[in-house]
């Protein structure tokens, strides 16, 4: 099978496509055929050496695919199930603990590979309304936005949400906020990107290059509530 390895952290030129054997399974693992992956800034930081990792690390934290084989102790999945990755595969339940927050793609091999053997608890079901490509974008950026707005923020219709920039978390936050009936204020330094945010539903747009005191603009739009 084909696989991408980071021969040594410190530059994109160190990413190499190699041929290697399909992985063997432990009893609690599944063999996942990776169908789609998405890139986020974490992956770039790993490749550039800004997040430490071992030589020959397989990068990428976000993916979706189909289970093609299961270990003899696996009970959660069966062959043919379509699933997606989770950012912290060792954090299964309970309060987060440092030793459980191993991030796939830097502390352990990630999804830049055709097949990966991974514990059954490291995957979750794809929502029925999403295809594999769409689901592959969710694990890190989508979940981060959800936790901030819904889980922690208890977002309600009619509230205002400020999204800064056009990174993955901001774009997901914009769409989630609109789904919940919130008013979204979006910032960027690019008029072209602001138009894309408008197309996604942003109610108010602020170019922080032409409006360097953009915070005051936000206060105006929210009756000084922020």
What function would you assign to each model-found segment?
Residues 2, 82, 182-184:
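Residues at the starts of beta-strands that form the adenosine-phosphate
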Residues 10-17, 41-43:
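Short N-terminal binding/cap micro-motifs at the start of the first secondary-structure element
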Residues 22-37, 47-92, 107, 127-129:
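Glycine-rich beta-strand-centered segment in the early N-terminal region that forms part
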Residues 87-164:
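NAD(P)H dinucleotide-binding glycine-rich loop of Rossmann-like/cofactor-binding domains
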Residues 163, 178-226:
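Adenosine-nucleotide cofactor-binding segment
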Residues 170-171:
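N-terminal Rossmann-fold NAD(P) dinucleotide-binding loop
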């Amino acid at each position: 099978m084909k696989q991408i390895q980071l021969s040594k952290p410190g530059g994109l030129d160190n990413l190499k496509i190699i041929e290697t054997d399909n992985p063997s399974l432990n009893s609690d693992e599944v063999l996942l055929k990776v169908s789609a992956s998405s890139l986020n800034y974490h992956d770039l930081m790993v490749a550039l050496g800004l997040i430490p990792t071992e030589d020959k690390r397989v990068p990428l934290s976000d993916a979706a695919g189909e289970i093609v084989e299961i270990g003899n102790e696996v009970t959660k999945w069966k062959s043919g199930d379509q699933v997606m990755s989770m950012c912290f595969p060792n954090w299964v339940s309970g309060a987060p603990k440092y030793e459980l927050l191993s991030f796939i793609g830097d502390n352990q091999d990630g999804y830049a590979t055709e097949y990966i053997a991974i514990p059954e608890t490291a995957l979750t079901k794809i929502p029925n309304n999403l295809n594999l490509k769409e689901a592959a974008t969710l694990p890190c950026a989508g979940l981060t936005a959800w936790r901030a707005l819904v889980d922690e923020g208890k977002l309600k219709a009619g509230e205002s949400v400020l999204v800064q920039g056009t990174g993955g978390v901001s774009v997901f936050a914009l769409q989630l906020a609109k789904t919940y009936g919130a008013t979204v204020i979006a910032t960027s330094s690019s008029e072209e990107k602001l138009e894309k945010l408008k197309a996604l539903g942003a109610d108010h747009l602020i170019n922080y290059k032409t409006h360097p005191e953009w915070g005051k603009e936000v206060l105006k739009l929210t009756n000084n509530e922020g």
